């Protein structure tokens, strides 16, 4: 017979070590051999933090009672089971779960779904995309404003050039039909200044008769008519000079004829347009208005 004693360093020294008494025989008992092998293997695999001391001693030849053997066996087996359970728990703690790539998973986990919907239904990175889009649009707007400003500046300059009056400008101090305008042109590398008469500015003539106001619109004559009149005047002046040399008495008669011709030319360029009469002519008109004095009305 032999005894096997198990004692742990973590147990208190006040308790007595538990002893397991086994009866050895020639034939092997299958019920006892398998658990012993398993427990001895677990004890050998257990970590070094819980070392176990095994002491063997000779037993007396006297056989113990079966009731005492059963009690000691139950206590010893429970102790061995606790040791095996502790060793298995340590192994589970040491073995970590293997990493699995997300591509190998067919279904999405709750965490991945939370990442996809963390910004109120929009995917992650959508804010950055929107900001980039807005930044691009703002840059395009600034470029458009620059191009419009550059295109608007030359148009304004062109307008200024078109609106610029001829140099030198007309004399604004002189008012009436006989205004003088100076024109310049180049001849043989020289600047020639000529004084000309511009077309009349007053386009309307006012005429009051029979209690009504009549307006006459002046139509500007063409350039060829002006040139013809100038040539005629020059020819007439030459003729007058020749006639003056011959007969000085015929000069006043010739001047009267010239004045008549000028009046005829002016009448051709003037067309009288009569507006609709609002006043009542004849005997039915109010004769009280005829006693009033004439008033001058200025319109702009």
Swiss-Prot record:
Ranges annotated as biased composition (Acidic residues): 233-262
Pfam families given in the database record: FAF
Comp. bias intervals (Polar residues): 30-56
Entry's Gene Ontology BP terms: regulation of meristem growth
PANTHER family, alphabetized: FANTASTIC FOUR-LIKE PROTEIN (DUF3049), PROTEIN FANTASTIC FOUR 4
Organism this protein belongs to: Arabidopsis thaliana (Mouse-ear cress)
Region listing for Disordered, in residue ranges: 30-104, 142-170, 227-264
Domain of life according to the entry: Eukaryota
Protein name: Protein FANTASTIC FOUR 4
Tissue expression per record: Expressed in the shoot apex and young siliques. Detected in provascular and vascular tissue, but not in the vegetative meristem. In inflorescences, restricted to the base of the flower and to the vasculature of the stem and the pedicels, but absent from young flowers. Detected in the center of the inflorescence meristem.
Biased composition, class Low complexity, residue ranges: 58-88, 142-151
Entry function: Regulates the size of the shoot meristem by modulating the CLV3-WUS feedback loop. Can repress WUS but is under negative control by CLV3.
UniProt domain FAF: residue ranges: 166-217
Similarity annotation: Belongs to the fantastic four family.
